[in-house]
Amino acid sequence: IVLVATTNLYEHFDKALIRRFDSVIDFNRYSQSDLMDISEEYLNKFLTKFNLAKKDIRLFRKIMMLLSPLPYPGDLKNLIKTAVAFSNPDDELDYFRRLYYTITGEKPEDIKKLQEQKFTIREIEILSKIPKSSVARELKEMIEDE
């Protein structure tokens, strides 16, 4: 008899149960770079599937890097698919805001925090929906007030 078992919850198994298997193989050997590449592939797939043409890989990578470490492919797929699928079809950049919210638990409204997270003024405009000129002015005023 050959029994093959797979799980994402290996660490929750009792050691006595694990000893009953002749072999235990760990396939979770993804580097963070591998996981970023996988997340980009999922993004491309879902943008095509949901007919969203606007893509900014640099911004996508910055948002994804807020997750440390990046989750494994199954979780990446769900995260990206949900952000794209439930985004506003009339706003091709809405999935960035949804992705940011899902990852941070916060709406991308605090422009100072976005700047601290190394987003550019253009990227802050996309995430916050505040015009670039207003973002630049507010950031300048914050610096002058310090």
Regions found by a protein language model. Give the residues of each.
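Short, solvent-exposed alpha-helical "recognition" segments
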Residues: 135-146
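Short, amphipathic alpha-helical "recognition" segments used to contact nucleic acids or chromatin
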Residues: 101-119
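Short alpha-helical "recognition helix" segments of helix-turn-helix
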Residues: 123-126
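Conserved H-loop
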Residues: 8-9
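Conserved AAA+ ATPase small/helical "lid" subdomain
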Residues: 49-103
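Conserved AAA+ ATPase core "coupling" helix
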Residues: 1-2, 14-49, 78-79
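DNA major-groove recognition helix of helix-turn-helix
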Residues: 80, 128, 139-140
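Short coil turns linking two alpha-helices in DNA-binding domains
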Residues: 72, 131-136
